[in-house]
């Protein structure tokens, strides 16, 4: 029947991590909830790129949004299922059970981040939910059931 995650970030992370371990997941958000997402791999690449930029590249501020992929939680769940299938392992079941307090919070989040400055520096977003899941698996080689 699955475990309800007590935090929003935990609920979103479980769509990939727990399901790839064969655990059933109950998500307190609707499947069509859209979020801005980035793999840890893309974030690390961005931090290295920013570190290597000359100070002049920043202009008057060093603040910069990192680009992200806009995706729905259903797209993330589907990508997890495809990754498990491709690896020949059982993916945990996915059940959607929206809770108004969580849904309201996430509905207020940005759905995408774009940054011309980041693009000029060669920093890019993940191309797809499948790319995010593949990066997760590279970072967590024992993440499959």
Residue ranges and their predicted role:
Residues 13, 74-78, 112:
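Short, surface-exposed alpha-helical segments at coil->helix boundaries
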């Amino acid at each position: 029947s699955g475990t309800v995650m007590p935090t929003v970030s935990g609920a979103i992370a479980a769509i990939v991590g727990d399901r790839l371990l064969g655990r059933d997941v109950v998500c307190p958000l609707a499947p069509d909830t859209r979020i801005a997402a980035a793999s840890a791999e893309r974030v690390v690449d961005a931090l290295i790129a920013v570190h290597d930029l000359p100070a002049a590249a920043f202009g008057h501020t060093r603040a910069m949004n990192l680009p992200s992929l806009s995706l729905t939680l259903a797209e993330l769940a589907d990508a997890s299922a495809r990754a498990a299938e491709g690896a020949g392992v059982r993916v945990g079941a996915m059940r959607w059970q929206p809770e108004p307090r969580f849904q309201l919070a996430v509905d207020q989040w940005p759905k995408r981040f774009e940054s011309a400055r980041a693009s000029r520096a060669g920093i890019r977003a993940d191309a797809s939910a499948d790319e995010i899941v593949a990066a997760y698996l590279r970072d967590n080689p024992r993440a499959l059931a």
